[in-house]
Regions:
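Pre-active-site segment of Zn-dependent metallo-hydrolases
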Residues: 13-25, 83-84, 88-101
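Glycine/small-residue-rich loop that forms an oxyanion/phosphate-binding "nest" at active or ligand-binding sites
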Residues: 59, 66-83, 91-100
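Residue-level detector of beta-strand structural context in well-folded domains
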Residues: 71-72, 115, 143
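N-terminal active-site segment of His-dependent metallophosphoesterases
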Residues: 1-45, 49-50, 60-70, 78, ...
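A short helix->loop->beta-strand "cap" motif at the edges of active sites that frequently abuts
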Residues: 50-52, 122-123
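Binuclear metal-dependent phosphoesterase catalytic core
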Residues: 6, 76-77, 99-103, 120, ...
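Active-site neighborhood of phospho(di)ester-bond hydrolases with catalytic His/Asp-centered motifs
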Residues: 5-7, 31-37, 53-58, 83-85, ...
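Active-site environment of divalent metal-dependent phosphoester hydrolases
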Residues: 10-14, 39-42, 59-65, 88-93, ...
Length: 159
């Protein structure tokens, strides 16, 4: 199973560049995870009928918060995956989000705009970075999770 992972799009409308990113990197994805800061529901139209699991982020308006929770757990092929945006300053964020979930193999998160693909305390912490905003990162990026006998994450740099 291939999951396209994206976060922190921060777009107010449908975007041609995002459409190209999705075509290039998520065409073969079975599922999409969006880890928040969507900003406008129309942005999700770019995923063209793929199953989307998303959470709201700190920059999302009430229209997004009414549709998507702040955190959730998704079970895929027997693996429990936590999905959360994140909050506050980046130092210590991973420790905070680890405390938000029990019995998960992976936590997908955003907020920092900086990609991460590391195991901590036996949990894969996976942040795809941001495809559109690199104020806090050297590169724009998205991510791919491959799920089978294990969960493997790949960060895909976009520039």
């Amino acid at each position: 199973m291939k999951i396209g992972v994206i976060s922190d799009t921060h777009l107010n409308l449908y975007d041609d560049r995002l459409e190209q990113i999705v075509a290039d990197h998520f065409e073969s994805a079975d599922i999409i995870f969006h880890a928040g800061d969507i900003v406008d529901l129309a942005v999700l139209d770019v995923f063209k009928g793929k199953q989307i699991y998303a959470v709201s982020g700190n920059m999302d308006p009430d229209s997004i918060r009414a549709v998507f929770p702040q955190k959730r757990v998704v079970e895929i092929e027997g693996w429990k995956i936590g999905l959360i945006h994140g909050w506050g300053s980046p130092p210590g964020l991973e420790d905070k989000i680890l405390r938000e979930f029990e019995d998960v193999a992976c936590i997908v998160y955003g907020h920092t705009h900086r990609a991460m693909n590391e195991v901590k305390d036996g949990v894969l912490l996976f942040n795809p970075g941001s495809p559109t905003d690199r104020r806090f990162a050297r590169h724009n990026s998205v991510g791919i999770l491959n799920i089978g006998r294990e969960i493997r994450g790949t960060i895909v740099p976009l520039d």
